[in-house]
A protein has these predicted regions:
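Structural recognition of the beta-propeller blade-terminating site
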Residues: 84, 131-134, 229
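Extracellular-facing segments of soluble proteins and assemblies that are Gly/Ser/Thr-biased and enriched
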Residues: 104-142
């Protein structure tokens, strides 16, 4: 009987230990499955508190905040977070980005229906990229696999419009002051352009670069427009842009002898 009691006590202790172990593993698994952004910015990152650095969505339910960390000689690293109106549901817009891409503050624009967000990211003197995010409930995540600006440049260099520049599209990485921007009017569906587009359907992008540093200067573009369709994911150049884009091509003056 003594041996039987010892076996039962031993089994009971083993079950308790196993239960504790399983509970611990379950908690660890749940923690690993939780979004990395749920906790919000780390202590190293400080909030930029200027009014221009915080943006509230048109429906007043989402706010964008910018945080920075001083990395010494390397510069500053920025994180861009969204929160709901109770400052909960923290979501990091740019996970994994280094100082090379997120070394400056950014500008942001919401679509009128608060379902889309564009980030205008300076990457150096005269250089800027665009990133597009889409809303799901109270959080935003990347809407495209590539930056929106890279997609716009792909469209330009593969279109007949680029042939006027007499440049090799393969050399695009060496261009100077490559700058993609938003044309004003995203917040009211570009009413000032005289177009009558569906609400929150299009984003109008301005593409720019110059010939600085080129020994034999070739034509370049300043403020060439294209439209991105948020519903279909396609780019186009509406007829209303024709006159404007015709003036976007710039030919450098001949080099003085």
């Amino acid at each position: 009987m003594g041996n039987k009691l010892e076996r039962e006590l031993h089994m009971s202790g083993w079950l308790r230990r196993s239960g504790f172990l399983l509970s611990a593993l379950l908690l660890l698994g749940l923690a690993a499955a939780a979004p990395a952004s749920a906790a919000g910015p780390g202590a190293e990152f400080k909030l930029r508190e200027d009014a221009d650095d915080v943006l509230i969505s048109p429906d007043r339910q989402i706010r964008v905040e910018q945080y920075y960390a001083d990395k010494g000689d390397a510069g500053f690293q920025y994180q861009f977070w969204t929160f709901d109106d109770k400052r909960q549901n923290a979501s990091l817009l740019n996970p994994g980005e280094s100082i090379d891409l997120a070394g400056y503050p950014a500008g942001f624009r919401f679509s009128p229906d608060s379902q889309w967000l564009v980030r205008m990211q300076k990457t150096g003197a005269g250089f800027q990229d665009l990133f597009l995010y889409r809303r799901k409930e109270m959080q935003f995540s990347s809407a495209t696999k590539k930056p929106l600006s890279e997609m716009a440049w792909d469209y330009f260099w593969n279109s007949p419009a680029s042939k006027k520049l007499h440049r090799n599209p393969k050399d695009r990485d060496s261009l100077s002051h490559v700058f993609a921007a938003l044309v004003k009017g995203m917040d009211d569906n570009y009413a000032w352009l005289g177009v009558h587009w569906p609400d929150s359907r299009y984003i109008v992008i301005s593409l720019n670069f110059d010939a600085q540093g080129e020994e034999h200067k070739l034509p370049y573009i300043r403020d060439w427009w294209c439209a991105y369709d948020l519903k279909t994911g396609a780019f186009s150049v509406p007829a209303a842009f024709a006159e404007h884009n015709a003036k976007a091509y710039t030919t450098p003056p001949p080099k003085r002898k």
